């Protein structure tokens, strides 16, 4: 089996995932997965595509991720891993699509407007 390369994005985070046959080692930016993502919810998000397709421990995954915050990075990795699982076996599509793991979340941060404090918040208004 050759190495499968897929890209996932979320907000401003970009994740590049390289999946190859192995013993289940997952490295993120040359660190172990548990060292990079310390909270349980983020670890669950990253492992979700592997759990749903029952491929935990079957593949070695090398991940390069940059940009955004820690949650955006975890969700970018989840999308890239989901795409890689579908590339490995088309039958995985049926398990991942209902969970919404193959859909790129289009929500981005709304820009700040001039004449306002933030994107939607206005400066204090004084009637008199």
From Swiss-Prot:
The keyword Ribosomal protein applies. Signal peptide: none annotated. Keywords: Ribonucleoprotein, Ribosomal protein. It comes from the Bacteria. SUPFAM superfamilies: Ribosomal protein S5 domain 2-like. GO terms for molecular function: RNA binding; structural constituent of ribosome. One of its GO terms (cellular component) is cytosolic small ribosomal subunit. GO terms for biological process: translation. It holds the Pfam family Ribosomal_S9. The keyword Ribosomal protein applies. Gene3D superfamilies: 3.30.230.10. NCBIfam families: PRK00132.1. Belongs to the universal ribosomal protein uS9 family. This is Small ribosomal subunit protein uS9.
């Amino acid at each position: 089996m050759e190495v499968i390369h897929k890209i996932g994005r979320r907000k401003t985070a970009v994740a590049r995932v390289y999946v190859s046959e192995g013993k289940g080692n997952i490295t993120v930016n040359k660190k172990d997965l548990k060292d990079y993502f310390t909270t349980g919810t983020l670890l669950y998000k990253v492992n979700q595509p592997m759990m749903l397709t029952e491929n935990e421990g079957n593949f070695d995954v090398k991940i390069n991720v940059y940009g955004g915050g820690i949650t955006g990075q975890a969700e970018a990795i989840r999308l890239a891993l989901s795409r890689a699982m579908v590339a490995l076996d088309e039958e995985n599509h049926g398990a991942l699509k209902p969970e919404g793991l193959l859909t790129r979340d289009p929500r981005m941060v709304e820009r700040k407007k001039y004449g306002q404090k933030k994107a939607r918040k206005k400066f204090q208004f004084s009637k008199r």
